[in-house]
């Protein structure tokens, strides 16, 4: 995985964990958890692509990997919508920068996951 992507994930997660949004902290914690799960999924998919021989074991171990992939895209769309929602409501520049960067990272990760998944098909 690209070291910039790792740093971006870590930076955004760290900044989000320090925030207190007007919405509930449960919403923010849910977003943080989703980001962490997305990072882990992206990493594992990327590793599978690098070891193309793992494609068959991936398919055998998880016959529903396409359903899982679809679910991850739904999660990405949900996170994008949440980031946009927060951006429309907040006037705090720290939050704006954080969520703009999170939005950019989500779009990059979505593109990477699409690329990985096409390589696995």
Swiss-Prot record:
Location in the cell: Virion; Host nucleus
Alphabetized InterPro entries for the sequence: Flu_NS2
Gene Ontology CC terms, in alphabetical order: host cell nucleus; virion component
Coiled-coil stretches noted in the UniProt entry, renumbered to this chain: none
Family from the record: Belongs to the influenza viruses NEP family.
Record's function text: Mediates the nuclear export of encapsidated genomic RNAs (ribonucleoproteins, RNPs). Acts as an adapter between viral RNPs complexes and the nuclear export machinery of the cell. Possesses no intrinsic RNA-binding activity, but includes a C-terminal M1-binding domain. This domain is believed to allow recognition of RNPs bound to the protein M1.
HAMAP family: INFV_NEP
The protein's name: Nuclear export protein
Natural source organism: Influenza A virus (strain A/Pintail/Alberta/121/1979 H7N8)
Encoding gene per record: NS
């Amino acid at each position: 995985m690209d070291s910039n992507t790792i740093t971006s994930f870590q930076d955004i997660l760290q900044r989000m964990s320090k925030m207190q949004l007007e919405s509930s902290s449960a919403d923010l914690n849910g977003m943080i958890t989703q980001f962490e799960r997305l990072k882990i999924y992206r990493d594992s998919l990327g590793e599978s692509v690098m070891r193309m021989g793992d494609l068959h074991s991936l398919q055998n171990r998880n016959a529903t990997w396409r359903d899982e992939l679809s679910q991850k895209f739904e999660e990405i769309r949900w996170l994008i919508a949440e980031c946009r929602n927060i951006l429309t409501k907040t006037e705090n520049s720290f939050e704006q920068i954080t969520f703009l960067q999170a939005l950019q990272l989500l779009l990059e990760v979505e593109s990477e996951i699409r690329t990985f998944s096409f390589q696995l098909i």
